[in-house]
Amino acid sequence: IEMGLTGNASGLMAPATLAFASDSKMAIPKATTIKFQTGIAEDTLLMASAHRVNWSAAQIDVKIAGASSLDVESEFSDTTAYSVGLGRKFTEKTSGSLSYSWEKGAGATSGSGFTMSNGSKTLSLGLKHQTNNLTLSGGVSYTKVGDVDVSALGGLLTAAYDDNSVTAVGLKASFDF
């Protein structure tokens, strides 16, 4: 994807209108996922996956004409995320899963405003229960995000992302008729 931008920005850093022109380039990365699963015991499934994304060939590059200190460039690195988990059928109506995922970070410092983490580690738990017409399912996932310090736009943008985590919870009820 390649695009060119022109436009006006009013009141960003001063009350005056700022006219700018930009020549921006972006790309969608190539990604490959390999998934594996096998039964390891009756009613127990082992799952694993690897997900590789070639981010280094998909950078974002925004050039602001006449204001090079405001240029924005990404520093995306190729990444590989791994996951391993177990699925278990407890009864004919109830099953659950537990998984652990991790992605190695690219470094604890970055010169790009697009960098907000340095890898991650995730623990997920899911549960499903079925009756005749009703299926209840839910899950919880906790992700610990790696720390990173960012200094971009010639030092105008600095940020320290430390001790961050994400907790996600999902619930679903479905009726069959």
Segments predicted by a language model, with ranges:
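Outer-membrane beta-barrel porins/channels
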Residues: 1-177
